[in-house]
Amino acid sequence: MISEKVFETYKGNQKIKGKIFSAGKSDVKLPVMIASHGFGCDCTEMESYCKYFSERGYLCLSYNFCGGGGRGELQSDGESTEMNVFTEIEDLLAVIEYVKGLECADTDNITLLGFSQGGFVSGLTASRLNEKIANLVMICPAICIPDHARLGMLGGAKYDLDNIPESWACPNGMVIGRQFHEAVKDMDPYLELAKFKGKVLLIAGEKDPVVNYSYQVKAYQCYEEGQCEFLMIRDGGHGFGADVMPNILVDIESFLQGKKNIMSVNVFCTKVEEFDKTDDMHRIGVFFTGYSDGDDFRGIILPGACDTQTKIGDGDYKLCADYTLSGVDKEKQECIIHVINKQAEDGYFRPTIDSDSKYIRNLIKGKDIVAALEFFDGGLTVRLWG
């Protein structure tokens, strides 16, 4: 059972309000996740993350930025015309200070997670605190904000750089002020983000209409080698729908468990064939092709790959994908990899993997491998974490 309660804290004389999510009383300190919402949204946007991870033993907090979002009982103080990324950094720092006063919080294990502007703010805050933050998860972070100021288009609006107004209305109805422009117009976001030396997970939509994908590639490149896991969601926009979100959560969970994304396979469906059908059973085969182009292995799926999907009665379809890849490993050795990926009793996809590559066998040896399936039009990306 997940408990939810409203909390409030202060930044100076401004009240910050939000919610705390936990799985109930615990006699041990819980790792902390603080979730920051995007521009023009509010803390309810982050509740799916908080509920999922509180069920898995985290103490989760979502909150409303001062002047940055929220309505009703959860609205924080402040005007939107006084808000910018630096005031939001101060908001997040105030929430972190609040967490330090909670007896059940393991303040040596804090994860900052944020979406869009909240993701950018989380990254900048992690850079300030560095070793005090264990993990940073940025989802479609709005790293474009400084460039948008330099182009006169903050918040999706258009304004004259030679005659900047004191305030303007954005397409989403939010009114922001000139001080936001002045605060970020000279910022190099990559220099700031690179100051953080902890673990980073960066998730981006390939077709994000708000934050061009190139910003996320450059952000990934600004971190040290091996520091950042970068997930590109094929056909993804600025945020993700219900068909993708469950596996985004598995990606994040695997990252927080210390797993590495050891391989991603892009799968494209070629045909569907009915294998068997009775009154209480239906079995189909989804045939597919595809490829993997990661650092540890590059290759293609061989012909004959099939996902056998079986439905008993009114239950859900159970999936069992069986396929072989042929290519080269990181040591440039030709090899094959055989994968059988099916859903375990705990609901996770737990593939078995075999290979004639010594490098690949050592890579997966002794690891609890979990697969996340991110569907897109015509196929899916299978991420293997271990």
Predicted features along the sequence, with ranges:
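Beta-strand-enriched cores of mature, soluble protein domains
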Residues: 261-386
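Short beta-strand/loop motif that positions the catalytic acidic residue
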Residues: 196, 202-204, 208
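The serine-hydrolase catalytic nucleophile loop
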Residues: 39-51
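Hydrolase active-site cap/lid region
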Residues: 128-175
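N-terminal cap/lid segment of alpha/beta-hydrolase-fold proteins
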Residues: 1-25
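Catalytic histidine-centered segment of alpha/beta-hydrolase-like enzymes
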Residues: 236-247
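Conserved alpha/beta-hydrolase
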Residues: 50-75
